[in-house]
């Protein structure tokens, strides 16, 4: 397994241990999108 790093904002990262199941992969993708949306919303 290996870790992947996703930069959500300049000060926020999400680290994910791969591989994931298809279901968990979809949930992590949704989590990252929502985190980016929330942080973008608060920076305006």
Summary of predicted features, one role per range:
Residues 1-44:
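Amphipathic alpha-helical "stalk" segments
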